Amino acid sequence: MSGLEAIWWRERPGPLGALAGAPLLLAEAPFRAAAALRGALYDRGLLPAARAGAPVVSIGNLAVGGAGKTPAALAVAARLAGRGRRVAILSRGYGAARADARVASDGAGALLPAAEAGDEPALLARRLPGVAVLCGPRRAELARTAVESLGADALVLDDGFQHRALARDLDVVVLDASNPFGNGHLLPRGPNREPPSALRRAGLVWLSHADRAAPERLEALRALARDATGRAPVESRHAPTALLDGALREAGALEALRGRRVAALSGLARPAGFLRTLEALGAEVALARAFPDHHRFTAGELDAVLREAAASGCAWVVTTEKDAVRLDPALAAAAGDRLRVVRVDAELLRGADVLEAALAAALAAAPQPRPAPRAPVA
């Protein structure tokens, strides 16, 4: 985590932290004004929101990175597919070398590597067979492709809360219950793209890491969610579900980490959560190397971490599945048995019935696609 990010996520920065962030206060004011103006233009219909021709469920957040949005998107897409829907996920594709519209998966299998699709689309494509994944900056264009070319009849808009150019039938906003708003400021002074008052646009609040939140904070967030949306929130924890090798194949039970001395390698917005996961699994984290979010590890970086791990007596270098999909297959193969990957999924603690009801209402309320016009009779 960089020095700036440390200021962002420190809820009570103290005098030195406040002083370090003071120059950014001047930049926060125009960002706040621009965000408010843009929101008002959409609220009043002066900026249009395109209809997709299929129900759209947006998964987003208020802050930048690390809220647990990807596990939530996985869970929502799986539940929609379980209802018999032909699902497509629309993603910005952060971390990709390309910025054009592209199909990462047509539902039959991954078509693009993470370097071209972005790490989150690559992960979603790998984890969700039968679900199409499209990526690019213009999500309305992706929606048309998904509906018209791939036959999708339910769309999941990944990181979509601020992407209001595409209309949606349900806005799910994910908050990290352990630290939902950081220092409370907007970019660049803080981590937030919008203030908490923006939750009034949401249809459902999802509290990730609810198991790590203090009881009084959890109660306050539940009240905030009900006041904003009229619904109780969904609450989840990041549950480790599999231990994989560098090629993302099963590599034994998670219990194998218990008592093992390991090195943690990550490129995440908030790497501390990954360290807590490893410690909860009983691993002894002797070494931790954290890179910026969406970072693609080079051969030199991976080799250096492997050497440090060996020198520290570590059995494995352990990384996340999102990091592993970015890893060049040749590098993963070279690491061999020295590399392990922990998969996590969103385990719902409360609100499964609320989620199902919200999805059902969104599917029922969405405008149905217009039938294609009949050809004139000769």
From Swiss-Prot:
Coiled coil: none annotated. ATP binds at A63, V64, G65, G66, A67, G68, K69, T70. Keywords: ATP-binding, Kinase, Lipid A biosynthesis, Lipid biosynthesis, Lipid metabolism, Nucleotide-binding, Transferase. One of its GO terms (biological process) is lipid A biosynthetic process. Pfam families: LpxK. InterPro entries: LpxK (IPR003758), P-loop_NTPase (IPR027417). Its EC number is 2.7.1.130. This is Tetraacyldisaccharide 4'-kinase. It comes from Anaeromyxobacter dehalogenans (strain 2CP-C).
